Swiss-Prot record:
Residues noted as binding GTP in the record, renumbered to the chain: S20, G23, K24, S25, S26, D37, P38, T43, G69, K126, D128, A155
Origin: domain of life: Eukaryota
Organism in which the protein naturally occurs: Caenorhabditis briggsae
Top EC class, one word: hydrolase
PROSITE patterns with a match to the protein in the record: RAB (PS51419)
Keywords attached to this entry: GTP-binding, Hydrolase, Lipoprotein, Methylation, Nucleotide-binding, Prenylation, Protein transport, Transport
Name recorded for this polypeptide: Ras-related protein Rab-18
Length: 202
């Protein structure tokens, strides 16, 4: 995904949260390994992947935490939110209940994230499915209300997956307070419009 011969600008902690079954693991595995398993088992506790990517000429290392959506794992909550610079909150466009519970997940982010300016991305997953129950307009409205980035995606078809991480990481890099200021020199292209409800142009 990037040239490992160059040292990374920084290491970023990225969380993927949301209800069980919305496709969190599938999104992570599609991004990291470019694979999709329709029989992907539910995450037990926390899964973890490390990868790297290059944004505007800056290589960054990503520590991606894929969290379980089940209530019985809520005791893990404070530890895995600690120090996160980015949070991807996923819902399933075919599951109305997963969308309605987004408010709960946003409350968790506000309660447990130690970085006040953590970058949040709302991902409407499974847009390849025909039985959609949550409209794009509803997702955009929620994202605007909670001041998060927004994108629609499909881990199955790959649509929007790369853009999800690229847009999130670019916004983090544009927020220097979120990462190590011991290395202040970095190169950025023209800043993109990352206002609430922005859709990646990939």
């Amino acid at each position: 995904m990037s040239d490992d011969s160059s040292s990374p600008l920084t290491t970023l902690k990225i969380l993927i949260i949301g209800e069980s079954g919305v496709g969190k693991s599938s999104l992570m595995l599609r991004f990291v390994d470019d694979v999709f398993d329709p029989e992907q088992a539910a995450t037990i506790g926390v899964d973890f992947r490390v990868t790297s990517m290059t944004i505007d000429g800056n290589r960054v290392k990503l520590a991606i935490w894929d969290t379980a959506g089940q209530e019985r794992f809520r005791t893990l909550t404070p530890s895995y939110y600690r120090g996160a610079q980015g949070v991807i909150c996923v819902y399933d466009v075919t599951s109305r209940s997963s969308f309605e519970k987004l408010k709960h997940w946003m409350t968790e982010v506000d309660t447990y994230c130690t970085n006040d300016n953590v970058i949040k991305m709302m991902v409407a997953n499974k847009i390849d499915m025909p039985n959609r129950t949550v409209t794009r307009e509803e997702g955009l409205k929620f994202a605007k209300r909670h001041r998060t980035l927004f994108i629609e995606a499909s881990a199955k078809t790959k649509e929007g997956v790369q853009c999800t991480f690229e847009e999130l990481i670019e916004k983090i890099i544009q927020t220097p307070d979120l990462w190590d200021n011991d290395r202040p020199t970095f190169r950025l292209g023209q800043p993109t419009d990352t206002s609430s409800g922005n859709l990646c142009g990939c």
